[in-house]
């Protein structure tokens, strides 16, 4: 029996690694999810725009269905996905191309998280104002 199996069998958890809940792993997962979300939005957006050529009446009907509170919340989610994807993309570029990037990757993750939260608050206010004006 090796020492890792012995350590786990005694109830102690092995050290946290990249694949066991490290913040960098969650950043990677969220980056993939935000990228897929943005791709899905762009796909639907292109289909909607193409609908204008087919039938302007159908296009207007589809746009009317987008004027609901749930779509307003989805817009806020889209802002969050684009903002996180952009900020984390900058962090990934710095890690890959800056010689000191790997050393500061955890600090950069916390900075990205802070900037994300600081920008999402005013974005939430703006989206909330638009929703309030639109749905009252």
Curated annotation (Swiss-Prot):
Stretches that traverse the bilayer: 32-52, 70-90, 109-129
Cofactor(s) this protein requires: heme
Main location: membrane
GO MF: electron transfer activity; metal ion binding
One GO cellular component, as annotated: plasma membrane
Membrane-topology descriptor: Multi-pass membrane protein
GO-annotated biological processes: tricarboxylic acid cycle
A Pfam family annotated for this UniProt entry: Sdh_cyt
InterPro entries on file: SdhC_prok, SQR/QFR_C/D, Succ_DH_cytb556, SuccDH_FuR_B_TM-su
Family per similarity comment: Belongs to the cytochrome b560 family.
Quaternary structure (record): Part of an enzyme complex containing four subunits: a flavoprotein (SdhA), an iron-sulfur protein (SdhB), plus two membrane-anchoring proteins (SdhC and SdhD).
Cited function: Membrane-anchoring subunit of succinate dehydrogenase 2 (Sdh2). Sdh2 may catalyze the two-electron oxidation of succinate to fumarate with a corresponding reduction of quinone to quinol under low oxygen conditions, when the primary aerobic succinate dehydrogenase (Sdh1) is inhibited. Sdh2 seems to be the generator of the proton motive force (PMF) under hypoxia.
Protein name per Swiss-Prot or TrEMBL: Succinate dehydrogenase 2 membrane subunit SdhC
Protein source organism: Mycobacterium tuberculosis (strain ATCC 25618 / H37Rv)
